[in-house]
Amino acid sequence: MGNSQTKEFRPPLSSSNRRSHQWGSSSSHGRSPYSDRHHAESSRSRGSRPDLSILGIGGSSERDVATLEHRRETKQEREARRLEKERAARVKERERSMREEHVDGGYLVTQGVYVGAEDFNKVVTRQLMIERRLAPFWRGLNDFSESWTEHQLMAAARGLPIPPPDEIPPELEYKNPPKLTEDGKESSIQHLMVPITSRSQSYGSEASQSSTPAHSLPTPVSPIASGTSTSPLFRSRAKTLASLTTSKLGSQIDSTPKEIHLPEDPFVNGQPIEAYLYKDATECPICFLYYPPYLNRTRCCDQPICSECFVQIKRPDPHPPEHGEAEPNATAAEGDRQDNQDCQLVSEPAACPFCVQPEFGVTYTPPPFRRGLVYATDPTLRPNFASPVSSTSSLASANAPPGTGRRRATSLSANDPTVITTDRVRPDWAQKLANARAHAARRSAAATALHTAAYLMNSTASGNESRNFGLGRRGVMRRTGQSETPSASSRSGSPALQALAFLTDRRTPGHETDSAEEGAGNLAPPRNSSRRNRIDDLEEMMMMEAIRLSLASEEERRKKAEKEARKEAKRREKESKKAEKAARKHGFYSNNASSSALDVPSDARLGRVTSSSSSITGEDASPSKGKEVDRASPSATAASSQSSTEIASDSMTINPHPNVVEHGSSAQSLMAQPSAREPPKPSHLRQVSSASSSFSSLVESTGEDHSGAYDGNASSTEPLFNFRSLAAVIGDEDKGDETAEHVEDTSSKPSAEGSASSAAPVADEMLGQSTAPADPIAVGTVAEERDCLMPKELETQSVEITSATRNTEATT
């Protein structure tokens, strides 16, 4: 709607767009590609307008890139660019000043002896030099000889190569100064005047008509007298108020004297000014350059020093007072305040580089002539305006003290009117000191607030008083104040407010007042304790924090040592357990299968059977055989034999058919069956493993395959079946042959033939055997009772039993 009409009927900004638009509209009523291009260009031109980019409506990408590049400029780059501009402007100003301005043959700008930053006040220095209270910047000579002629002195002063003494270059030739005529006097007077725009209308007439000092001085220009002739006599109220408000500024401007140029006269007493100045050159003891003898003199030791060295001497940077020294610039009214602020930064005045006396200052005795710039308000120069100083005139009798030629015997005070101190050319030292003090106060306040907030938060979070010993007496006072005023802690309970209260320390949080007048009255007076106490408290807190950290590190080291000791004890305990296990294993195999355990005499056939079983197996005893099986004491031998007898009778009674086991399963499967049952007690196992008797031997030969299915808990009827089965085995001799045939027949079975052995030997032979062959069965029984944890060992033991049975057959 309105926007589309604006697009259609807004005139383009450029003339080319206007021509294309007119041509396209006159050629055809329809839309043309030229008109489309015109609309696109006009929209782009409207989008790139700077007034729209301010509102954020549009803007070109090039301008955005330029803006980003401008924003990327860092502070250091801006400072470097500013310093470069200042240096270029200073070089240009130095060239102009050296070409156009001078004071008695010297200059108002430095000559490049020092290349550092010129941080002295150039306006004040220029004013002091024009007033002849400070020596100008003379051009220094690297070399000097008293035998130099006038043209050699001129060449050295102008920076030219020094010619031979008997040869005068053309540029150094000079003629005697001509005498001035009346026309020359008038022209010189006009030359000495200030420009007409900067002085009053009656200045020229006064200067030309009168030559007395009283009438020749310029009248000060006041704001009322500076009004135009067409202005009304009575001004409006607004102008009157404006003049009153600017009267102070106007008085300051009018108090500044006007600079005027004295007539150009390159000769003094018939000599060129350079030759007159440098004929008695003096060396500056600091920069070792030769200058005219009109140098500054120190007020204390009367040593010469050039102005370029003098303006480089300044106060040291603000620093804390050393050895309890007081503020040197403090007045008597600030004595009490200084006691309260004894740790503030101080700025010591510069000391003399020769005698190291403080309040360094210089005096200056100008030469007996005047050249170059002067101030028009100087009353001693006004009588000579009509008759300028000639080459033969001198001001020694008019305004310069007579030169006695000897040094001053006494030092001058720093407050002497003729003394110029270093603070005079650097009047901003007080502002620098105030800025440094404010910066140090901010840093100290920030550090104090951080420490206090950290301690307050730690004490609030922990809730114990052990961490609060680092707060010192200030923390004790704060805790006491908070305990006395519980309502104040509810109002200012946050650590930030407490830190702020600690920082100001004007009043405690409990002394807050609701009225603004009482609050302002409490904040106005400073606190009683000084800043030194605050610094001491801060140092105390920092020392306590260091002690706390040291104690924490010592505690951590002790805990680490205890942990290492515990680990070492555990390691030693493990090693002792391993050694004990190894000792028990070696003791088990050495005492196992021996007759000494049961005090039973051994037999030759028993040894033969044991050796044959060991040779059949073909391997040593495994380290895991009989693991964690304790040997029974000899006192428990009777109980062990009784238990083994019960187990043997039980196994023979429960499973009296060995053929079922022969054809049904292997010995390993029979060993695995008791795992589903509840194992007996370990003491019972130890008794079984250590038991060795004739009954267990008989059980080995007859009921090996039935041992896997016995029930250890069914021991109530064991004695009846035990003796009955034993009597049947011993009494029946006819079954011996059948049993031998049966064992011979089953020995060819692959898996169960070792387990299905019977009582082939004669009963008296079986009863006479020792209990040594019962040990492998006992070991197998132990492994069987421990839920078949080692099936390979059980299988090996079964093989040993089979071999023992075969050897028994062979013996029979």
UniProtKB/Swiss-Prot annotation:
Low complexity composition-biased segments: 14-33, 200-211, 386-402, 632-651, 689-701, 748-763
Domain of life: Eukaryota
Compartmental location: Cytoplasm
Main location, first listed in the record: cytoplasm
Polar residues bias spans: 796-812
Region (Disordered): 1-97, 160-187, 200-232, 317-339, 385-412, 508-532, 554-718, 732-812
Gene Ontology CC: cytoplasm
Keyword field: Cytoplasm
Biased composition (Basic and acidic residues): 34-44, 61-97, 172-187, 317-326, 554-582, 737-747, 783-795
Entry similarity comment: Belongs to the SIP5 family.
Described purpose of this protein according to its UniProt entry: May negatively regulate the snf1 kinase.
Entry-linked PANTHER family: PROTEIN SIP5 (PTHR31315:SF1)
Name this protein carries in UniProt: Protein sip5
